[in-house]
Amino acid sequence: MIYKFKVFFALIFLFPNLYSETLSVMTFNVQNLFDTTNDPYKDDKAFLPIKEKLSEKHKKECNKIYVKSWRLECLYLDWNQKTKDAKLNNIFKNIISFGESGPDLIALQEVENNNILRQLFFLLKPYGYIDYKLLENNDKRGIDNAFISKYKIFNPKLHYVKFSSKFQRNDTRPIFEATLKINESMIRIYNAHFPSNYY
């Protein structure tokens, strides 16, 4: 299985207070990184082992999905431990291929929860990563933004986007803000992932 990602920026930031230190940043849409556990508070029905997809209730819910590829995924994808681990390992390999040991900061999109984020973090930990953060938001599919970092992460918070009634949508995803401390400098970082036209 091959998972594509885009590095929208792998930038080096230079700050006067950091002397000559640099910070490398990667942003990575991991495209539905789910664990294998059914969460009744999230729409994760596509990302379950096939043995949990056999009920008529599950099939009925899947058949309500408008987009054909998503509907088939909900019905037939066997999201088991082996499948999930293969995806995690592909993401891990892509991250550490950046530079010698991965970027200093990774901004991730489409992560289900802290459980699956923690699994990715422990794969990366031997490469100098020390912290990770994810805050649950109100996205109806249950996917969140997250950070994994070689620096300590402070003050995580979500900024919800408010629209006028003319442009209001059923849901939107908040912007995830956090702060890194590098030497004596506090640097704010932001992670945004906006809904597709299907929502």
Where do the model's predicted regions map?
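Classical Sec-dependent N-terminal signal peptides that target proteins to the secretory pathway
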Residues: I2-S20
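Sequence-level detector for tyrosine residue identity
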Residues: Y3, Y19, Y41, Y66, ...
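Basic side chains
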Residues: K4-K6, K87, R173
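Residues in flexible loops and secondary-structure boundaries
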Residues: F9, P16-N17, Y41, I116-Q119, ...
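N-terminal, active-site-proximal structural segment of metallo-dependent hydrolase catalytic domains
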Residues: Y19-L123, N137
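Feature marks short, surface-exposed loop/turn motifs that line or immediately flank catalytic pockets
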Residues: N32-F34, P195-Y198
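A short, polar/proline- and glycine-enriched secondary-structure boundary/capping micro-motif
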Residues: T37, Q168-R169, Y199
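Structured beta-strand-rich core segments of catalytic domains in phosphoester-bond hydrolases
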Residues: L105-A107, V111-P195
